[in-house]
Protein backbone atom coordinates (compact mmCIF):
# COMPACT_ATOMS: atom_id res chain seq x y z
CA UNK A 1 0.00 0.00 0.00
CA UNK A 2 1.18 3.51 -0.87
CA UNK A 3 2.20 6.01 1.80
CA UNK A 4 0.67 8.95 -0.09
CA UNK A 5 -2.52 9.19 1.99
CA UNK A 6 -4.62 12.17 2.99
CA UNK A 7 -6.93 10.93 5.74
CA UNK A 8 -5.95 9.84 9.22
CA UNK A 9 -7.86 6.53 8.91
CA UNK A 10 -5.98 5.77 5.70
CA UNK A 11 -2.69 6.59 7.39
CA UNK A 12 -3.49 4.25 10.29
CA UNK A 13 -4.29 1.46 7.83
CA UNK A 14 -1.03 2.02 5.96
CA UNK A 15 1.02 1.98 9.15
CA UNK A 16 -0.71 -1.22 10.29
CA UNK A 17 0.18 -2.84 6.97
CA UNK A 18 3.83 -1.86 7.37
CA UNK A 19 3.87 -3.03 11.00
CA UNK A 20 2.45 -6.42 9.98
CA UNK A 21 4.95 -6.81 7.13
CA UNK A 22 7.94 -5.99 9.34
CA UNK A 23 6.69 -8.45 11.96
CA UNK A 24 7.13 -11.25 9.42
CA UNK A 25 10.82 -10.32 9.14
CA UNK A 26 11.08 -10.41 12.92
CA UNK A 27 9.68 -13.95 12.85
CA UNK A 28 12.31 -14.85 10.23
CA UNK A 29 15.04 -13.64 12.59
CA UNK A 30 13.56 -15.69 15.43
CA UNK A 31 13.77 -18.79 13.21
CA UNK A 32 17.34 -17.97 12.18
CA UNK A 33 18.40 -17.45 15.80
CA UNK A 34 17.06 -20.92 16.61
CA UNK A 35 18.80 -22.37 13.56
CA UNK A 36 22.19 -20.93 14.52
CA UNK A 37 21.78 -22.11 18.12
CA UNK A 38 21.20 -25.65 16.85
CA UNK A 39 24.18 -25.42 14.47
CA UNK A 40 26.43 -24.25 17.33
CA UNK A 41 25.40 -26.99 19.73
CA UNK A 42 25.42 -29.85 17.21
CA UNK A 43 28.72 -28.79 15.61
CA UNK A 44 30.29 -28.58 19.07
CA UNK A 45 28.96 -32.05 19.92
CA UNK A 46 30.33 -33.61 16.72
CA UNK A 47 33.60 -31.69 16.30
CA UNK A 48 34.35 -30.51 19.84
CA UNK A 49 34.46 -26.93 18.62
CA UNK A 50 31.81 -24.21 18.39
CA UNK A 51 32.21 -22.28 15.10
CA UNK A 52 29.97 -19.42 16.28
CA UNK A 53 31.15 -17.07 19.03
CA UNK A 54 27.93 -15.06 19.07
CA UNK A 55 25.25 -13.58 16.83
CA UNK A 56 23.53 -10.21 16.49
CA UNK A 57 20.26 -9.61 14.67
CA UNK A 58 18.06 -6.68 13.77
CA UNK A 59 15.08 -5.66 11.64
CA UNK A 60 15.70 -2.47 9.65
CA UNK A 61 13.75 0.50 10.97
CA UNK A 62 10.85 1.95 8.99
CA UNK A 63 12.84 5.17 8.50
CA UNK A 64 15.87 3.29 7.13
CA UNK A 65 13.66 1.34 4.72
CA UNK A 66 12.00 4.52 3.43
CA UNK A 67 15.38 6.23 2.97
CA UNK A 68 16.76 3.25 1.06
CA UNK A 69 13.71 3.05 -1.21
CA UNK A 70 14.06 6.77 -1.96
CA UNK A 71 17.76 6.36 -2.80
CA UNK A 72 16.84 3.56 -5.19
CA UNK A 73 14.12 5.70 -6.80
CA UNK A 74 11.37 3.30 -5.72
CA UNK A 75 7.84 3.98 -4.54
CA UNK A 76 7.33 3.83 -0.78
CA UNK A 77 5.24 0.65 -0.73
CA UNK A 78 5.56 -2.72 0.97
CA UNK A 79 5.60 -4.34 -2.47
CA UNK A 80 8.63 -2.28 -3.53
CA UNK A 81 10.24 -3.01 -0.17
CA UNK A 82 10.00 -6.77 -0.71
CA UNK A 83 11.30 -6.57 -4.28
CA UNK A 84 14.20 -4.16 -3.83
CA UNK A 85 15.46 -4.41 -0.23
CA UNK A 86 16.93 -7.74 0.81
CA UNK A 87 18.54 -6.77 4.13
CA UNK A 88 15.42 -5.81 6.09
CA UNK A 89 16.17 -8.77 8.33
CA UNK A 90 19.86 -8.96 9.13
CA UNK A 91 22.00 -11.37 11.13
CA UNK A 92 25.68 -10.98 11.94
CA UNK A 93 27.56 -14.11 12.92
CA UNK A 94 30.89 -13.70 14.69
CA UNK A 95 33.36 -16.58 14.41
CA UNK A 96 36.75 -17.25 15.98
CA UNK A 97 38.53 -18.34 12.81
CA UNK A 98 38.26 -17.74 9.06
CA UNK A 99 37.75 -21.48 8.56
CA UNK A 100 34.68 -21.32 10.83
CA UNK A 101 33.06 -18.84 8.45
CA UNK A 102 33.18 -21.26 5.53
CA UNK A 103 32.15 -24.17 7.76
CA UNK A 104 29.00 -22.27 8.75
CA UNK A 105 28.23 -21.51 5.09
CA UNK A 106 28.67 -25.18 4.16
CA UNK A 107 26.24 -26.20 6.91
CA UNK A 108 23.68 -23.64 5.72
CA UNK A 109 23.93 -24.98 2.16
CA UNK A 110 22.65 -28.33 3.44
CA UNK A 111 19.50 -26.86 5.00
CA UNK A 112 16.53 -27.56 2.74
CA UNK A 113 14.40 -24.84 4.35
CA UNK A 114 16.86 -22.11 3.36
CA UNK A 115 17.95 -21.02 -0.11
CA UNK A 116 21.15 -19.05 -0.64
CA UNK A 117 20.33 -16.42 -3.27
CA UNK A 118 23.61 -14.50 -3.43
CA UNK A 119 27.12 -14.74 -1.97
CA UNK A 120 29.54 -11.82 -1.66
CA UNK A 121 32.93 -12.93 -0.38
CA UNK A 122 34.77 -9.85 0.86
CA UNK A 123 37.31 -12.09 2.59
CA UNK A 124 38.78 -13.41 -0.65
CA UNK A 125 38.17 -10.04 -2.34
CA UNK A 126 38.20 -7.24 0.26
CA UNK A 127 36.56 -3.89 -0.41
CA UNK A 128 38.96 -1.06 -1.39
CA UNK A 129 38.80 0.35 2.16
CA UNK A 130 40.01 -2.98 3.61
CA UNK A 131 36.62 -4.30 4.75
CA UNK A 132 36.42 -8.08 5.04
CA UNK A 133 33.36 -10.23 5.68
CA UNK A 134 31.24 -12.83 3.94
CA UNK A 135 27.70 -11.75 3.01
CA UNK A 136 24.81 -14.04 2.12
CA UNK A 137 21.36 -13.14 0.87
CA UNK A 138 19.07 -16.02 1.78
CA UNK A 139 15.39 -16.76 1.27
CA UNK A 140 13.37 -18.73 3.79
CA UNK A 141 9.74 -19.58 4.58
CA UNK A 142 7.95 -18.04 7.55
CA UNK A 143 5.00 -20.16 8.66
CA UNK A 144 2.13 -17.93 9.80
CA UNK A 145 -1.26 -19.04 11.11
CA UNK A 146 -2.99 -18.88 7.73
CA UNK A 147 -0.19 -18.77 5.13
CA UNK A 148 3.48 -19.20 4.38
CA UNK A 149 5.50 -16.13 3.40
CA UNK A 150 8.93 -16.31 1.80
CA UNK A 151 11.26 -13.53 2.90
CA UNK A 152 14.85 -12.60 2.17
CA UNK A 153 17.44 -11.82 4.82
CA UNK A 154 21.09 -10.86 4.88
CA UNK A 155 23.61 -12.88 6.86
CA UNK A 156 27.04 -11.35 7.49
CA UNK A 157 29.70 -13.75 8.77
CA UNK A 158 33.02 -12.45 10.02
CA UNK A 159 35.76 -13.08 12.56
CA UNK A 160 36.19 -11.20 15.84
CA UNK A 161 39.04 -9.20 14.28
CA UNK A 162 36.96 -8.31 11.20
CA UNK A 163 34.07 -7.23 13.40
CA UNK A 164 36.30 -5.09 15.62
CA UNK A 165 37.71 -3.31 12.57
CA UNK A 166 34.29 -2.78 10.94
CA UNK A 167 32.83 -1.42 14.17
CA UNK A 168 35.70 1.05 14.62
CA UNK A 169 35.53 2.17 10.99
CA UNK A 170 31.78 2.76 11.26
CA UNK A 171 32.21 4.85 14.42
CA UNK A 172 34.92 6.99 12.81
CA UNK A 173 32.83 7.67 9.69
CA UNK A 174 29.78 8.45 11.81
CA UNK A 175 31.70 10.82 14.10
CA UNK A 176 33.26 12.68 11.15
CA UNK A 177 30.00 12.70 9.17
CA UNK A 178 31.61 10.58 6.41
CA UNK A 179 34.25 13.28 5.82
CA UNK A 180 37.29 11.20 6.77
CA UNK A 181 40.75 12.57 5.87
CA UNK A 182 42.99 10.42 3.67
CA UNK A 183 45.50 9.91 6.48
CA UNK A 184 42.83 8.16 8.55
CA UNK A 185 41.53 6.07 5.65
CA UNK A 186 45.10 4.94 4.96
CA UNK A 187 45.55 4.03 8.63
CA UNK A 188 42.26 2.15 8.64
CA UNK A 189 43.29 0.16 5.59
CA UNK A 190 46.61 -0.65 7.23
CA UNK A 191 44.74 -1.74 10.37
CA UNK A 192 42.54 -3.99 8.23
CA UNK A 193 45.66 -5.71 6.86
CA UNK A 194 47.00 -6.16 10.39
CA UNK A 195 43.66 -7.64 11.49
CA UNK A 196 43.77 -10.05 8.54
CA UNK A 197 47.34 -11.03 9.40
CA UNK A 198 46.17 -11.77 12.95
CA UNK A 199 43.31 -13.92 11.61
CA UNK A 200 45.72 -15.89 9.41
CA UNK A 201 48.24 -16.25 12.26
CA UNK A 202 45.62 -17.53 14.73
CA UNK A 203 44.25 -19.96 12.12
CA UNK A 204 47.78 -21.29 11.61
CA UNK A 205 48.20 -21.81 15.36
CA UNK A 206 44.83 -23.58 15.50
CA UNK A 207 45.90 -25.96 12.73
CA UNK A 208 49.12 -26.75 14.62
CA UNK A 209 47.13 -27.57 17.76
CA UNK A 210 44.56 -29.65 15.84
UniProtKB/Swiss-Prot annotation:
The keyword Calcium does not apply. SMART domains: RelA_SpoT. Pfam families: RelA_SpoT. It catalyses: GTP + ATP = guanosine 3'-diphosphate 5'-triphosphate + AMP. Its EC number is 2.7.6.5. Pathway: Purine metabolism; ppGpp biosynthesis; ppGpp from GTP: step 1/2. Keywords: ATP-binding, GTP-binding, Kinase, Nucleotide-binding, Transferase. It is an enzyme of class 2 (transferase). It comes from the Bacteria. InterPro entries: GTP_Pyrophosphokinase (IPR052366), NT_sf (IPR043519), RelA_SpoT (IPR007685). Disruption phenotype: No visible phenotype, double yjbM-ywaC and triple relA-yjbM-ywaC mutants are also viable. Induction: Weakly expressed during exponential growth with a marked and transient increase at the onset of the stationary phase. Protein expression is very low during the first 3.5 hours after inoculation (at protein level). Induced by alkaline shock. One of its GO terms (molecular function) is ATP binding. One of its GO terms (biological process) is guanosine tetraphosphate biosynthetic process. Functions as a (p)ppGpp synthase; GDP can be used instead of GTP, resulting in an increase of (p)ppGpp synthesis. Overexpression in relA mutants (triple relA-yjbM-ywaC deletions and single relA deletions) leads to growth arrest; GTP levels fall drastically, various guanine-related nucleotides are synthesized (ppGp or pGpp), the cellular transcriptional profile changes dramatically and 70S ribosome dimerization occurs. Overexpression in the presence of a wild-type relA gene does not have these effects. Homotetramer. The synthase activity of YwaC is weaker than that of YjbM. Belongs to the RelA/SpoT family. This is GTP pyrophosphokinase YwaC. The gene is ywaC.
